[in-house]
């Protein structure tokens, strides 16, 4: 089954084909070369725009090449000099402000070099991340997934960034930006545009000895043509970076008529929906994950710490775990399709919480170190895999089972309700695109959580 559309199909054929043809002409003018073996279309693809194979394509074939001069970012925009001069006052937590100012200028300029490219998104209506959903819809469809909380944080941050950094800078350059035209609503749309369509070049690891000098990630940039490809976890193409250009290369054989898919990385459905506005149909996403809040494991331990002495011991244990930076107030333990992905943190947490008072005192005196510590990474990973959970001690399993159950209870619907809906093809077809994507997210998470619950529940 193909992935659900990254960009829902809307509008008539003419309104889509004319901008697409203009874009292809622009590609020729900037020496963006497209292989004769592929073509762009909105028919037969997983999205309004997509790339299809005209004929069989072998592994290693270059599907298209784009020169770096055709990329859109703060170093190529017409206002790059102004942005460079104001570099200091444009610093922000996201690091996106220079790119967003570039996009605001180029998107609203009738003479922009990138106009044929940016015209593919005439009003950003195709962007459908949850940040554009109502609060009620988010809570109804996505409660428990972690997305509503992320959206609230995103909206607060972008509004603060616009008011404190972007607006003052625009007001100091009225010849280039107009706050009436380049308003918060446009800024929000462009933030979503960057989230969904930008690319970040991987940081080169030139000097492995410089461990202390951690390199900053490269800033995002817009890559025309690359963002026409849709994503699935089992992709068949990959973007490669060279000093002169970027190339999309097939990583396996692609059959005639097959869609060319890129990848955004190993992303769970909640991440895909949050950042890109789509989700892979359940159970197709091999990178699916589910989170259990660290606080839920603490609550599970608190249920059996009935005496005042035991409650104090639990608080001391948790405090030490915090000091060791193993847990945090808003932290989560992450589970994937095969078990815990944060096995070091989870193993240490379960071990400390289940220690007797004497063993914990010894542990604390040694500042978290044990002389004969046999808990290497391989053992931790195996013990907290789905193959190993059933063999854990009763105390460890109880904490995991209670925490997983609490997490499952945080959703609006139980797992069986969602599973029945997924299996009812008629009911599934009647769902809106938002309802369907939300279902894929919920069911992917619940499936993992239910497995944890089943593997750790007490023997009857």
Swiss-Prot record:
CDD domains: SET_SETD6. GO terms for cellular component: nucleus. GO terms for biological process: negative regulation of NF-kappaB transcription factor activity; peptidyl-lysine monomethylation; regulation of inflammatory response. It comes from the Eukaryota. The keyword Transferase applies. Its main location: nucleus. Keywords: Methyltransferase, Nucleus, S-adenosyl-L-methionine, Transferase. GO terms for molecular function: protein-lysine N-methyltransferase activity. Residues 28-265 form the SET domain. It is an enzyme of class 2 (transferase). InterPro entries: N-lys_methylase_SETD6, Rubisco_LSMT_subst-bd, Rubisco_LSMT_subst-bd_sf, SET_dom, SET_dom_sf, SETD3_SETD6_MTase, SETD6_SET. Its EC number is 2.1.1.-. Protein-lysine N-methyltransferase. Belongs to the class V-like SAM-binding methyltransferase superfamily. Histone-lysine methyltransferase family. SETD6 subfamily. This is N-lysine methyltransferase setd6.
């Amino acid at each position: 089954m193909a992935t659900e559309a990254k960009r829902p199909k809307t509008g008539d054929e003419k309104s889509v084909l004319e901008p697409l043809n203009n874009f292809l002409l622009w590609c020729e003018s900037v020496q963006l070369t497209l292989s004769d073996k592929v073509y762009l279309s909105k028919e037969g693809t997983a999205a309004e725009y997509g790339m299809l194979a005209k004929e069989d394509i072998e592994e290693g074939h270059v599907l298209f090449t784009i020169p770096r001069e055709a990329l859109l970012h703060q170093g190529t925009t017409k206002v790059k000099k102004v942005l460079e001069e104001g570099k200091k006052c444009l610093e922000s937590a996201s690091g996106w402000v220079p790119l967003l100012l570039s996009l605001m200028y180029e998107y609203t300029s009738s003479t922009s070099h990138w106009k044929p490219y940016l015209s593919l998104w005439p009003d950003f209506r195709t962007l459908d991340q949850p940040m554009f959903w109502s609060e009620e819809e988010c809570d109804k469809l996505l409660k428990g997934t972690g997305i509503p909380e992320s959206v609230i944080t995103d909206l607060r941050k972008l509004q603060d960034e616009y008011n404190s950094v972007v607006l003052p800078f625009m007001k100091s350059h009225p010849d280039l930006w107009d706050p009436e035209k380049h308003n918060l609503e446009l800024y929000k749309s462009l933030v979503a545009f960057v989230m969904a369509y930008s690319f970040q070049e991987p940081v080169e690891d030139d000097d492995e000895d410089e461990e202390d000098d951690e390199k900053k990630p490269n800033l995002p940039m817009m890559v025309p043509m690359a963002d026409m490809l849709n994503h699935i976890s089992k992709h068949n193409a990959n973007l490669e970076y060279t000093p002169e250009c970027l190339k999309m290369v097939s990583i396996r054989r692609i059959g005639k008529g097959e869609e060319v898919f890129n990848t955004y990385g190993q992303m769970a459905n909640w991440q895909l929906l949050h950042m890109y506005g789509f989700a892979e149909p359940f159970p197709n996403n091999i990178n699916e994950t589910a989170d259990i809040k660290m606080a839920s494991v603490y609550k599970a331990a608190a249920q059996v710490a009935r005496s005042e002495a035991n409650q104090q011991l639990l608080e001391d244990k948790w405090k030490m775990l915090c000091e060791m930076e193993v847990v945090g107030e808003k932290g989560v333990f992450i589970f994937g399709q095969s078990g815990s992905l944060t096995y070091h943190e989870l193993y240490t947490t379960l071990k400390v919480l289940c220690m007797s008072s004497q063993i914990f005192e010894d542990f604390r005196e040694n500042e978290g170190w044990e002389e004969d510590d046999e808990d290497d990474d391989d053992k931790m990973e195996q013990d907290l895999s789905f193959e190993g959970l059933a063999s854990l001690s009763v105390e460890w399993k109880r904490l995991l089972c209670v925490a997983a159950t609490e997490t499952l209870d945080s959703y609006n619907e139980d797992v069986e309700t969602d599973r029945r809906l997924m299996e009812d093809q008629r009911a599934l077809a009647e769902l809106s695109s938002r309802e369907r994507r939300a279902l894929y997210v919920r069911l992917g998470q619940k499936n993992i959580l239910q497995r944890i619950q089943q593997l750790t529940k007490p023997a009857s």
